[in-house]
Regions:
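Conserved, structured C-terminal
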Residues: 2-266
Length: 266
């Protein structure tokens, strides 16, 4: 297993809780380095430092394979959290500097730029991607978070959580995730984070889970949950607002993400 800093222990506990005795488990997080390469030129950049095939046919979205970069064996996954084509590159920690420098050197020909956590957070919100610990957690289920497309009952497999999901499958969710944009489009005004109250007229109907300013679309974006009885469809064009530092800011619900690029088939 390779785990992120925030959820490594959570993921490890969950996996070990459910695997059988016949399965061997090992946490190799500290043995490997993950480098993320995202953007329209990421495929071309990798093709210039490796002889492997990075086309859509060579590595499809959500697939992975071993490749060779500058003489180093690298596990490449075609995944992206920023709404653009991208790759995650995993290699032994003692080889990671060599791969990093090879990418930086070739990146000078492709407009490569370092990317911080907040930049990634903005772009994932533009694309409607949810963040574990904020937008989704053990307190939410797929039906509440708009993730029912990720559930399938077609196969006769008793997956973890199947029984619990079947019980709520046909029930109205107790809350629903909403994507919102503020009518005030000034950067950082207000400073949106999370846990801000969501109002319908003068009544609190939910709370925000994520917030940021999109420089690409010049809009303040917020995600949040609204309580049952307030369906997303019924709240469109209603008098909604988010309260920040005792001031209410009008918001509009959007049904689709701001960035709707198809990154799967390119």
């Amino acid at each position: 297993m390779i785990g992120p800093a925030a959820t490594r222990e959570h993921d490890k506990f969950h996996i070990k809780k459910h695997i059988s005795e016949e399965v061997n488990f090992k946490d190799v997080t500290e043995d490997l380095t993950c480098l993320g390469l995202y953007g329209p030129n990421s495929r071309k950049l990798l093709s210039n430092i490796s002889n492997d095939d990075f086309t859509n046919e060579g590595i499809k979205f959500s697939h992975g394979k071993f490749v060779n970069i500058d003489g180093v064996k690298v596990w490449a996954q075609r995944l992206s959290y920023v709404g653009e084509i991208g790759f995650e590159l995993y290699t032994n920690i003692d080889e990671s500097k060599k791969i990093f420098l090879a990418i930086i050197k070739e990146g000078k020909n492709h407009g490569l730029s370092p990317c911080g956590a907040h930049a990634m957070d903005i772009m994932r919100m533009e694309s409607g991607f949810l963040h574990w610990g904020h937008d989704i957690s053990p307190e939410e289920n797929q039906y509440q978070a708009g993730l029912k497309f990720a559930i399938s009952y077609k196969k006769n497999i008793n997956f973890v959580g199947k029984e619990a999901l079947l019980k709520i499958k046909d029930q109205n969710p107790t809350k629903s995730l909403a994507m919102m944009v503020l009518k005030d489009n000034r950067p950082g005004e207000p400073l949106l984070l999370h846990e801000e109250p969501i109002y319908l007229d003068d009544k609190i109907i939910g709370r925000t889970t994520s917030g940021n300013y999109s420089f690409n679309f010049k809009k303040n974006i917020s995600f949040g949950y609204v309580n049952s009885g307030n369906t997303i469809e019924n709240l469109i064009n209603k008098n909604l607002s988010i309260e920040v530092e005792k001031k209410k800011y009008p918001v509009t619900i959007i049904k689709k993400p701001l960035n709707q690029k198809n990154i799967k088939d390119i």
